[in-house]
Amino acid sequence: MNPMTSTILLMTIMSGTSIVLMSSHWFMTWLGFEMNMMAIIPILMKNYNPRSMEAATKYFLTQATASMILVLAIIINLMHSGQWTITITENITASTLITIALVMKLGLAPFHFWVPEVTQGVSLSSGLILLTWQKIAPLSLLYQIYPSINTNLLLTMSLLSIMIGGWGGLNQTQLRKIMAYSSIAHMGWMIVIMIYNPNLSLLNLFIYIMMTSSMFMLLIANSATSTSSLSQSWNINPTITTMMMATLLSLGGLPPLTGFAPKWMIIQELTKNNSVILPTLMAILALLNLFFYMRLTYSTALTMFPTMNNMKLMWQFQPTSMTPMMTMLISISTLALPLTPLFISLS
């Protein structure tokens, strides 16, 4: 793809998300979502093969359906309240439809089926945008309307997402699908705390974006797309492989890494609100995620496929391609647990 075209499309994606973040008017919010969707589709198709075309089509159909439901909800809300303001969402039907539309855009269960398929069909760089930046706008809108959301509906979807995100990733060998199921599970953790402490949900989103961006950058640096390619990465680049192992364990929420902090704070907040069964179930289901991250870590660092003798020396002659941005992201993703008191004060 032409660099100028890529720049224009990325600027349009950022503009669409910014419009959603800054708007208090339903029409401008819908416009921001549409700008965002129309700009990312060419980025998903940049490899231009049948798989990326199929992935882009699935993404378009899902997002277009969600936008139609959102417009219907906006019209119903306008008929009852006479207001275009986002925070005035008094009608139960409109509120439920808006929640369903935003959950479809986020890829939460039971509307999660498009996420693994689309992520698997696109390149690693497109998957990075899809699983990080594209989550910001729907979550910011949920943050604004959370007082009028049906609590039981949101909690059910959250718990289902954590469950499916764990179970779905168990039998996967493709890294992009594993990251997609990981995203579904992390979204479940973010949404479950939205009702009790929305600021903590935004903090969780920030940490999730840091960890997922680090992981995708390491996969791009290693050109790894499956578990078998990870098994050969230690011979080629041990530095990046070690960092990948730490980032994977952080994504799984293993202490003393950064990924443990949001899970710790969310469970603490839920227990403060006299909820015991829900955080217990969430903690148990989080072990499913941790299991497939541990399996990936084992494939990455503790196994080696049979290789030629000269391949074992490749890392001595190949420079490690680390950028300052990647170094900063990996540091935040793995070593920020001592900053937990600061995170608690911010939430």
From Swiss-Prot:
Topological category with respect to the lipid bilayer: Multi-pass membrane protein
Function according to Swiss-Prot or TrEMBL: Core subunit of the mitochondrial membrane respiratory chain NADH dehydrogenase (Complex I) which catalyzes electron transfer from NADH through the respiratory chain, using ubiquinone as an electron acceptor. Essential for the catalytic activity and assembly of complex I.
Keyword GTP-binding part of the UniProt annotation: no
Subcellular compartments: Mitochondrion inner membrane
GO (cellular component) term, any one: mitochondrial inner membrane
Gene this protein is translated from: MT-ND2
Reaction(s) catalysed (UniProt annotation): a ubiquinone + NADH + 5 H(+)(in) = a ubiquinol + NAD(+) + 4 H(+)(out)
Family, as annotated: Belongs to the complex I subunit 2 family.
EC number assigned by the record: 7.1.1.2
PANTHER family: NADH-UBIQUINONE OXIDOREDUCTASE CHAIN 2
Keywords: Electron transport, Membrane, Mitochondrion, Mitochondrion inner membrane, NAD, Respiratory chain, Translocase, Transmembrane, Transmembrane helix, Transport, Ubiquinone
Protein name: NADH-ubiquinone oxidoreductase chain 2
Gene Ontology molecular-function annotations: NADH dehydrogenase (ubiquinone) activity
